[in-house]
Amino acid sequence: MTEIRLTNTKSRRKEAFEPIDRKNVRLYVCGPTVYDRAHLGNGRPVVVFDVLFRLLRHVYGEGHVTYVRNFTDVDDKINAAALARKDAGDPRSLEALIRERTDETIRWYHEDMDALGALRPTHEPRATEWIGAMIAMIEDLIAKGHAYEREGHVLFRVRSYRDYGALSGRSVDDMIAGARVEVAPFKEDPMDFVLWKPSDDELPGWDSPWGRGRPGWHIECSAMSYELLGATFDIHAGGIDLQFPHHENEIAQSCCAHPEGGFARVWMHNEMLLVDGRKMSKSLGNFFTVRDLLDQGWPGEVIRMVYLGTHYGRPMDWTAEKAEQAKTTLRNWAEMVEGAAPGEVRAEVVDPLSDDLNTAGALAALSDLYKRKDAAGLLGSAHLLGVDLQAIRHQPWARPYAFEELDGRFLREGIDYQPTVGVIGWGEITDQARETSIGLLHRWLALRRAGDFETADRLKTDAMRLGVELRAQKSPNGVTGGLAKLADRVDVSALEGLL
């Protein structure tokens, strides 16, 4: 059987992975707080640990891996968004507004992560569905002397857990010395953190032995992982930004509640994401959601390839140049596997993935299969990285095009300054498909000229889903026109519904 080696953040070493139970390998990844769209950095752990999930299934069998990724749907940011709606005059209850917001955000998240080719986890628990389990764990921590109640708050006694700081390599005293925050008067120790906090009548809350309130962030993952995976499981993963305090606090409360378990054996953290060499920030104007990039025309498969091009343990830099290179690579690979049947996953692709999830090395191995014209091996092996070349083959952006038909005259320098539109496709373009595509182009360009970019982006996304890529392009004399790329299978009647 293939040996997998993973870097364990806690031991700071690359270790041979040996599951507790080969018939049920268990993985927990911290999921999103569902108050807004997932940004580009949020997508990285999804793709990275999706590949880990696929690798574990490949080695141990699809039915022998349990993957849990949670949704945090109780949070002050969610409350603030709902309160803003209510203050703006929405007559519905705060509970209804919160539920609408979280349901909508989860739907967005699924749509965006599906576009990135990520498999759905085995379980996706919502925190609000496990409040009872959180209360039970808090009661247990109090009974064992690891937590205390003050003024409606329940706090974890950090100094009661002697190994606190082992994951992040910090000591409690150093953390206190470096702190620059005001300490709540009800805390016994500045490092103690909240397990439960009171809710006033305006905020969401649940009845508990300490009064009406809501859970702290850290207890949510501890309770849900225990209920779904047990006191001991194989791998806990997430972004490096969660290492402290979230994961450190998870370890403390879980190990104190269930000292017989030991919580997660292996801890994995992906590094942060940069954009053109700089930290992603709204103030720098380089902040993107996954949906922003999809709506700009970057296919989800291309975004995924850029993620995979850098080892998860190193910062990843998103650039348009990398995305264009990934697009070209995928187009070439998809063209070569035309008509091929998937072969077995090749060992030269499995080997780098088994060596601490070296996705860049696995992509290099796929490139070698392409160079050797091993279409079956390329097609089958790409699936292990979540790259479906057969599906990509039918995407408008990935097709080779046989000819071009233009509506209106060609633009000629100094002669014709009117915008024109073109339609290109694979094989014969029917009159109906050409006329419908031209109509969509004219409508899309008109919306852009009018400044209604939201409607224009929505039209472009809808057309792409139906097999037509709308693209603006300039002629040599600077006049903006448009081009529609048609896939080989286009539902023209559905397209007409967009006009």
UniProtKB/Swiss-Prot annotation:
Enzymatic class: ligase
UniProt keyword Secreted present: no
Report any Pfam family annotated for this entry: tRNA-synt_1e
Q: Which residues take part in binding Zn(2+)?
A: 30, 221, 246, 250
**Reaction catalyzed:** tRNA(Cys) + L-cysteine + ATP = L-cysteinyl-tRNA(Cys) + AMP + diphosphate
Q: Name one GO cellular component term.
A: cytosol
At which positions is motif 'KMSKS' region? 279-283
Cofactor binding comment, as recorded? Binds 1 zinc ion per subunit.
The UniProt family comment states: Belongs to the class-I aminoacyl-tRNA synthetase family.
PANTHER family, sorted: CYSTEINE--TRNA LIGASE, CYTOPLASMIC, CYSTEINYL-TRNA SYNTHETASE
Q: What is this protein called?
A: Cysteine--tRNA ligase
